[in-house]
Each structure stands twice: as C-alpha cells, then as structure tokens.
Amino acid sequence: MRDGIKVRLVNYTKKPLETVTWAALISYWDEWETEAFERLGEKDVEMHLPRILGYGHESILEHAVLTFAIEGCSRVCSHQLVRHRIASYTQQSMRYIKINPRDVEETFVIPESVKKNPELYEKWKKLMRETIQLYEETYKAGVHQEDARFILPQAVRTKIVVTMNLRELKHFLGLRACERAQWEIRDVAWKMLGEIAKNEELRPIIRWAKLGPRCVQLGYCPEGELMPPGCWKRTREKWKEVALG
C-alpha cells in the first residue's frame, strides 16, 4: 500500500440522474405516474434537473446513493470520515483481522512531514516495528486479538466501505476537499470526486450540483482570513482538472 490511498466507486443507484429528476417532478404532477420514470430520457434530465437544483431544491439528491471502497487510509482518516453521520459505513475489523508483520509502510501511514526528517523517520519506523512485534507477542501469549489490538496506533491502515446519498456527498466534498481539511481525508475527497468524474452516467451532476469544495459550490471562499494564500486559484484549477477533465 505504498502507493497511498485507493478509492473506488463500486455501486450507485440505477439511473441516478433520472431517479433524482423523477422525484423532483413528482412535486408538480397531479397523478402518481410511476410509468413516467421509464419514459424519462437524457433530454428530460437536462431540461429539468439543472433548473430545479438552481432553485436550491437539493433534497431530491437524497434519492440517489453511491457506494465507495476506500483502502489504505489510516484510522485517523476513517475517524474523520465517520463523523459524517448521514451515511453508512462498514470498516475492516481489528478484532478479526491480524496485522501482518510486513514492511511498516504496508501496515502504517507515515506522514510526508515526518519522512522529510530522516532521523525522525527512522525513529518512527523503529517504534512501529517494535509495536508490531509486541502486538504479535501479545496474541501469541494467549491474549485475545480483540485485546491485543489496543496497542496499535491510529496510523494503522484500514479498509472501509462508504455509502452516501448525493446530497450528503456534496456536503462531505464541500468540507473535506477544502485545502484546510486534513491532508488524508482531503485526498479521499478528491479521489471520490475523481471516481464520479470518470463515470459518464454521473459526471453531469458534478456541474449541475456543483460537487466539490465549498469555494466551488459558493463561488467564494467562506474561510475568510483562514484561507491559505493562493488557495482559491489552486483549488479552482484542481477542480477543473479532476472534475471536468
């Protein structure tokens, strides 16, 4: 896992944009026309969805959900992720999955800021090797794995499946794709956006719902004096590259 965090879009609502559009149009119909869903085409979506979202009626986005598989992030990152409570999560269990005593960077996330200091970097790796060794000694001594895991640091890599509706995903990206977000969760956010951008069926919603950091959604940076120098330009350019290709 030396190549960093992997994010993959594994599933999503069938005909997601048609589903969202149909749900929106229900508000205006006198009759419950479920058959109308099958009649909705690309032109209908393009005619209605951008206009309805432009009015701020974003609750309709909740009718489409996306499921992502995230691999290789630390538990520091996953703890931030699960704070977004309008979502579903299933995480790799440290009670049943033993840590494999391989290269420490296959097992733990080490920040780049630490790697820039060679002496400190070696101390980190030494401590992590010792941690793995003691972890193994603990469960080999008969201590249950659910107790042996207590020694593991938050740097340990994990896997997690995340399911969010489009409205919550917009909220998540607004906060976590921001340059002020912690670097690891920010990486996850941009990779999630990249997965949507690669999907022809989903790609239009990026533009219509303004999926991305809050500066993209709002047209200005809401961080005020906390905005990092040059952030506005960097973020907009990155969004165009990732989201629009």
Curated annotation (Swiss-Prot):
Record EC number: 2.1.1.148
Motif (ThyX motif): 83-93
Signal peptide, first to last residue: none
Positions with a binding annotation for FAD: 59, 83-85, 91, 165-167, 171
Entry keyword set: FAD, Flavoprotein, Methyltransferase, NADP, Nucleotide biosynthesis, Transferase
Function of the protein: Catalyzes the reductive methylation of 2'-deoxyuridine-5'-monophosphate (dUMP) to 2'-deoxythymidine-5'-monophosphate (dTMP) while utilizing 5,10-methylenetetrahydrofolate (mTHF) as the methyl donor, and NADPH and FADH(2) as the reductant.
HAMAP family: ThyX
PANTHER family reported for this sequence: FLAVIN-DEPENDENT THYMIDYLATE SYNTHASE
Family stated for the protein in its record: Belongs to the thymidylate synthase ThyX family.
Protein name as annotated: Flavin-dependent thymidylate synthase
Lineage summary: Archaea, Methanobacteriati, Methanobacteriota, Thermococci, Thermococcales
